[in-house]
Design a protein with these regions (language model features):
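Fe(II)/2-oxoglutarate oxygenase catalytic core
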Residues: 1-214, 219-245
Length: 245
């Protein structure tokens, strides 16, 4: 009998969560899924995901992504190496940059990378009435209609630079991050979702604690902090946007 993949914790304090989101426009929901399903998702990301890459080096550069199987070829692998070096240069000059491992749930679903596989089922769960109902209740946004998403792994030396997520015209209303890394993540290992004020000070930071769901209204200035070379594991997550169209 297959293991359940995505079951919400039935004891979530929905009214309290909605109050906090209305107050600050961001929150972290701990123990959002049942322990069993969160562990199953973590195993899928750690052991059953064909990881590609996502890279951008400068605000004027276009995001670059590559599927895992393409990275086995010499020419694309060399291009990835050069683009990673470019992200160092961009970040050093105070320009926007990011690099991390990625698997697009939406592209995989539409292009039938693994039809009926766990990643397809996960995207369906993210758009099912149970999850979308929780999201509408917590955010106070009854017009949310769908969720997109991708799996991400911020491994050693990966980061996401400060930016806004200002794609309001595309229907982005709320960003979400479902954290699925190891249980005892340590602060020195980075990978925090942080929010900045206008002076560049950090207002709030969320540890990527296992089985927690970060939600924040967009646009807000935020980043994912650098994961250092001594981090023992990657920061696994499912991320995306809740949309009104």
């Amino acid at each position: 009998m297959p293991k359940p993949l995505f079951v919400l914790n039935p004891d979530l304090p929905r009214d309290e969560l909605a109050t906090e989101f209305a107050r600050s426009g961001r929150l972290q929901i701990r123990d959002v899924l049942t322990r069993e399903t969160a562990e199953e998702l973590r195993d899928i990301l750690a052991n059953r995901t064909e990881w590609g890459v996502a890279i951008q080096a400068g605000a004027k550069d276009k995001p670059f992504s590559l599927r895992g199987r393409e990275m086995q070829k010499p020419a694309p692998a060399q291009e990835v190496t050069e683009r990673v070096k470019a992200t160092d240069r961009a970040a050093a000059s105070r320009d926007y940059a990011f690099r991390h491992m990625r698997y697009s749930l939406v592209e995989g679903y539409l292009e039938k990378w693994n039809p009926g596989g766990p990643h397809d089922l996960l995207l369906e769960h993210l758009n099912a009435p149970e999850f979308m109902g929780l999201m509408r209740a917590v955010t106070g946004m009854p017009d949310l209609v769908k969720a997109d998403g991708h799996a991400s792994c911020y491994a050693r030396q990966h980061f996401l630079g400060k930016h806004l997520d200002s794609h309001v015209a595309e229907g982005w209303r709320v960003a979400y991050v479902l954290n699925l890394t190891i249980d005892d993540w340590y602060p020195d290992w980075g990978g925090y979702l942080v929010f900045y004020d206008d002076d560049g000070d950090i207002e709030t930071g969320f540890m990527p604690r296992f089985n927690s769901l970060n939600l924040f209204r967009v646009p807000q200035a935020h980043a994912v902090t650098y994961v250092p070379p001594f981090a023992p594991r990657g920061r696994y997550a499912i991320s995306g946007w809740l949309r009104d169209r």
